């Protein structure tokens, strides 16, 4: 086990003492050592209400091989050895003597686990207080810090009773759980937008669900975590509308210029406002939906309000879904504008009674994963006031990069046949309300047909519809600070979405952080080896509470999880830069790779059907030596590595080839070859319900990325796809003459990948990708000019 920690601060001793007193500990350096140890260790069992109960708890802790903590305290000690203190500390942190560590040498385990410690014996009360302060900020076996663990057991439950008025509590630069999340005020409002996406002549009203600390009713104003979540009110069965992968790749007769595919913002409609008949300070509707994001729940107990809004076309709101269109961005912005006092909302949909977010400080962070993170990124690119930061996990920065690639229809990994129209149906939760649907069904079906037409599955080309869903175009407008989190094995929302957005905001005068993990499309807030919750606590305390805690400097710019060394996260200045830390090597495919042939015929669709494969089994087989697809691919290998190497950046392919057809699909996979136990792409559960989000509150599982039980022969590092009629970009077309050589350039997905010595790099070049592209029936023959082809690989040195 490794408990990496990036968010721990080390303030000077006076600040440490003041903070210890602020959380209710007896922390006077002038007290005797004996009295201080008794007071402090007794305080560490808040679940024990009497001295007798506390003494029993103390008797369960071993100081060394000879005595318990209760017996040791009874001797009124005047000092404590470093070893004895950390024997006690480890048990308080949830580790077991004899099982997890040796009482004769706790430091061996602490070093391996990356736990901090003082380097000397405790010979004074000041030493003790320093050790206790460090202990409170040390991570437990249960992922959270020790102070969080104490608070989860009731240590801070009476904090507000001792204050003249409700307030936030900060410790070590981070806000603490001194609010009872169980008592949160739950309410619903309807925010008036500027849009009419369902074409009924009225401004769409957008439902927003609010959970705010009860202390706001006593005058406390709080910042807001806002999650724009299209799934919040449920999803629909999309089996009937999911596309069957087409069997013919169209020959494109014409392309377009950049100007022709550039979308121009539409002029806002001049719509009448909903009538106003009064104002209220209390909502009329209870929020019946439960919060569905543990990250938000964690901060609700720390004095942040949490707001969810599903947006246009969802249950209890007006409008139609647009799958990432400007209307969905505007819907998220409308919620922020209400939270900052710049837009009206109503207590119900009909009476015209307005309500303000009077409890809000007007400081907002957007959070969430996938579609939720996508809308956070989209809102940030508007430059809306009040949005201080986004914490965007696996978000889409351009919808073309989600459903298309280089002139091809390319489904997100794991969702073959999905497209923008399918997702629109999936999230159109208005249809769950029959009384609502009967009034809009015909208009919705007409609207959906427009999405199906405009997404253009026939050519897969980039057009104005996709351009309107490219948020990177407006990245220069971003004013909010940005945290991006992404899985390096996320083939659903591929890593290019994060890295291209990261590059687009690189020169902006904002703070920005990037976290890259070895998972697929998953959260990392409950991954034990990373202190992600503390990192974001430090960040949000700075961003939303205005605390000068140095978060922008303390937190690394880039944190990357290693794919070989278990539970290892490394800090870097940037991704794929600066130049002094990176080098690129261009490898010729003929002289630097071994290949049995330079040609293949793509029989993948026939093989897929004959093998009764699935998308998942195909993805395994296409990168496995000697699989059923061996004749439908080109397999190129390099010699085994003599030393460890780390790829970091965007692999780039230059390829000269000829095909025997006027159109074709080319897919490329970069492979780590060699039998090994590699990390699973989904973190495994290590403690069911082990992460507590607040005192007597919700829990979630603690997870960890682990090597698989069985070795595998290969692992996908990166991949890319291209329609060979689009060698330059996704909108210009180049005619293919069968049998005549032509050249293409192809960027693969960004990666950070540690290759151990002894492994081999392999390059797999093939045609149709059964898991993601369409599945042509017609076979195509590919002839690769290896001597005039190369791949450029970026390395961190």
Curated annotation (Swiss-Prot):
GO biological process terms, alphabetically, are: proteolysis
Top enzyme class: hydrolase
A Gene Ontology cellular-component term: cytoplasm
Subcellular location(s): the record lists: Cytoplasm
Q: Which SUPFAM superfamilies match?
A: alpha/beta-Hydrolases (SSF53474), Galactose-binding domain-like (SSF49785), X-Prolyl dipeptidyl aminopeptidase PepX, N-terminal domain (SSF81761)
One function term, GO molecular function aspect: dipeptidyl-peptidase activity
Q: Which UniProt keywords apply?
A: Aminopeptidase, Cytoplasm, Hydrolase, Protease, Serine protease
Per the UniProt entry, the Enzyme Commission number(s) are: 3.4.14.11
User: What task does this protein carry out?
Assistant: Removes N-terminal dipeptides sequentially from polypeptides having unsubstituted N-termini provided that the penultimate residue is proline.
Subunit organization: Homodimer.
Family according to the record: Belongs to the peptidase S15 family.
The name of this protein is Xaa-Pro dipeptidyl-peptidase
Native species of this protein? Lacticaseibacillus paracasei (strain ATCC 334 / BCRC 17002 / CCUG 31169 / CIP 107868 / KCTC 3260 / NRRL B-441) (Lactobacillus paracasei)
Upper lineage: Bacteria, Bacillati, Bacillota, Bacilli, Lactobacillales
